Amino acid sequence: SGDYRLEADRSCSAFEPLRCDVFVTESTFALPIYGWQPQREVIDEMLRWWTENADASRASVLFCYALGKAQRILAGFADAAGASLPGAIVCHGAVESMNHAYRASGVALPDTFAVGDVERAALRRALVLAPPSAARSPWLRRFGTASDAFASGWMQVRGTRRRRAIDR
């Protein structure tokens, strides 16, 4: 194992220890230098960031891993804001294919859209979920001036934040 979900949400159960003879793990983020806010506080902070950007007609580009992290964020927004989100949620194709798999397995996620399905003016209020590999790609240019963030435990590391040159 490698990832330990400390809090359950609609996208995934929390880690459950099981009795076994041998357990092999890699757990970088278990080191004492990492401290984690409760999931709801992180989602509320993301929602405030998105709302501030939407109010300024600026897209919010949130880089996150296409499998797992993106769906955790979507589930968190649905639970925190329900139907009162500040704009459309636009997903990169890599994220959207994973959303389809989650929905097919019965996980309820908020509505998400391909970039071509959202009016150009509405893109300035959108939350854009994209994998880190999409950074500085032609795909992102269509959102114009945007605020960007990266949802990853690696952002707890000061050097990573500096190297990525991301707003948050």
Task: Identify the function of each model-found stretch.
Residues 2-4, 27-29, 67, 94-95, ...:
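Active-site metal-binding loops of divalent metal-dependent hydrolases
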